[in-house]
Design a protein with these regions (language model features):
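N-terminal beta1-alpha1-beta2 submodule of the flavodoxin-like/Rossmannoid cofactor-binding fold
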Residues: 1-109, 148-149, 153, 159-176
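Short, glycine-/small-residue-rich phosphate/pyrophosphate-handling segment
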Residues: 108, 112-151
Length: 176
């Protein structure tokens, strides 16, 4: 069984969700480096439509629920974001805000994410990951019942700060 109770097969690829504005960014480069040689699908939030959270729960058709379904099937999901003003990018923050829907109107889909493995991959200009982002991501995982397996950080497109965190994520993605 996969985390969260769903059937996991050898063909279930990991999932990386890219939340950077330009498609060819430092963060996109880091995603390619982290996932090199592993089965991993990519969702570029900048290339799809996801409406901002609405308390009324009324949305024009968008891709949010499709992405959540992919996350529920993946052995691990990597949230990849540049660090802007000590936090996620705007597109990543908007995506995470929509998880409130899973606690209001899409409860069964939200349940499928419990005990799933999530990791954060961040790129920024500082020597280390911003502590506020670390806390925000860990609390996000806790709030939906997911397991935060690692926080991976690199300065722009430089070396990863913590090779141990990289190894944890790659193992979860199927590296032997």
């Amino acid at each position: 069984m996969a985390p969260g109770g769903g059937a996991r097969t050898a063909s279930s690829p990991a999932l990386a969700i890219l939340g950077s504005a330009p498609g060819d960014s430092h963060t996109a480069t880091l995603v390619r480096r982290l996932t090199a040689g592993l089965a991993c699908d990519l969702v570029d939030l900048g290339a799809i439509s996801i409406a901002p959270f609405s308390p009324a729960q009324v949305y024009n058709p968008d891709s949010f629920l499709d992405v959540i379904a992919k996350m529920a099937a993946a052995p691990v999901t990597v949230f990849a974001t540049p660090v802007y003003w000590y936090s996620y990018s705007a597109v990543m923050k908007g995506f995470i805000d929509r998880f409130t829907d899973l606690q209001l109107t899409h409860l069964q889909l939200g349940v499928r994410l419990r005990r799933r493995e999530f990791a954060l991959l961040a790129s920024g200009s500082e020597a280390e990951l911003e502590p506020a982002l670390n806390i925000a991501f860990s609390r996000f995982c806790d709030s939906i019942g997911a397991r935060c397996i690692a926080l991976v950080y690199a300065r722009e497109d430089g070396p990863f700060v913590d090779p141990g965190a990289v190894a944890l994520v790659r193992r979860a993605m199927g590296e032997i």
